[in-house]
Design a protein with these regions (language model features):
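Catalytic phosphate/metal-binding cores of nucleic-acid and nucleotide-processing enzymes, i.e., regions
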Residues: 1-139
Length: 139
């Protein structure tokens, strides 16, 4: 049986690699290693997106506690983003609905789930400044 911590870290690295490649980042996103020792830190940060990555064998819907964990980590600093995957299921991303439409009330309890590729499209389409800022700061 695989070690769950190793499985989680491997998933975080996969997401960092995929996001870096898909968004055309000059420098690969790096895991926040302190998150293993300090509570209330996300796994990855990209622009205003505070990313928590969860990889589990069974299930269809993410646990409420997972969303609360990333909401707590991003409090007053950024947009909570839960990236999750269950075996034999596609990678999905839960974000606050207001991050798709800024005319909506800012309320992190109102969410939507996207496929990972759709999340990448969302960033490229609505938040290109995050890509530009990241590439500028990484240069």
């Amino acid at each position: 049986m695989p070690n769950s911590r190793n499985k989680g870290a491997a998933f975080e690295r996969l997401i960092a690699t995929n996001m870096s490649e898909e968004l055309g980042l000059n420098v690969k996103l790096k895991r926040i290693l302190e998150q293993t020792r300090e509570k209330h830190l996300p796994d990855l940060i990209f622009g205003d997106w505070y990313l928590e990555c969860k990889r589990y064998a069974s299930g269809k819907e993410p646990a409420t506690a997972w969303w609360q964990q990333v909401v707590d980590a991003s409090k007053d600093k950024g947009t909570p983003t839960l990236i999750y995957k269950f075996d034999r299921q596609p990678i999905k991303v839960r974000i606050p609905l207001h991050s798709i439409n800024n005319n909506l009330l800012v309320d992190n309890s109102i969410t939507c789930d996207l496929f990972f590729d759709d999340f990448i499209y969302l960033i490229k389409s609505l938040y290109p400044q995050h890509i530009e800022e990241y590439n500028r700061s990484a240069a």
